[in-house]
């Protein structure tokens, strides 16, 4: 999901997406430990998406508009 698409979502939708991404990250890390993960760069992408969502939520909390 692109940052512009994320900014269009409501806080509730962003929190739901954040929870989904955290669950996905947990599953990817588990697969990595078991040696089942083929593409380890997917962990990096999920972590960046989590950071983007947290940034958007914090901007909204502080009243910063981009």
UniProtKB/Swiss-Prot annotation:
Task: Tell me which UniProt keywords the record has, alphabetically.
Answer: Ribonucleoprotein, Ribosomal protein
A Gene Ontology BP annotation from the UniProt entry: translation
Q: Which InterPro entries match?
A: Ribosomal_protein_uL29, Ribosomal_uL29, Ribosomal_uL29_CS, Ribosomal_uL29_sf
Which SUPFAM superfamilies does this chain map to?
Ribosomal protein L29 (L29p)
User: What Gene3D superfamilies is this protein classified in?
Assistant: 1.10.287.310
A molecular function annotated in GO for this UniProt entry is: structural constituent of ribosome
GO CC term, one of those recorded = cytosolic large ribosomal subunit
Q: Which family does it belong to?
A: Belongs to the universal ribosomal protein uL29 family.
Looking up NCBIfam families in the UniProt record yields: L29
What is the protein's given name?
Answer: Large ribosomal subunit protein uL29
């Amino acid at each position: 999901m692109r940052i512009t698409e994320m900014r269009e979502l409501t806080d509730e939708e962003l929190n739901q997406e954040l929870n989904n991404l955290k669950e996905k990250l947990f599953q990817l890390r588990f697969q990595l430990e078991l040696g089942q993960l083929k593409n380890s760069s997917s962990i990096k992408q999920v972590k960046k998406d989590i950071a983007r969502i947290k940034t958007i939520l914090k901007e909204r909390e502080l009243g910063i508009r981009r």
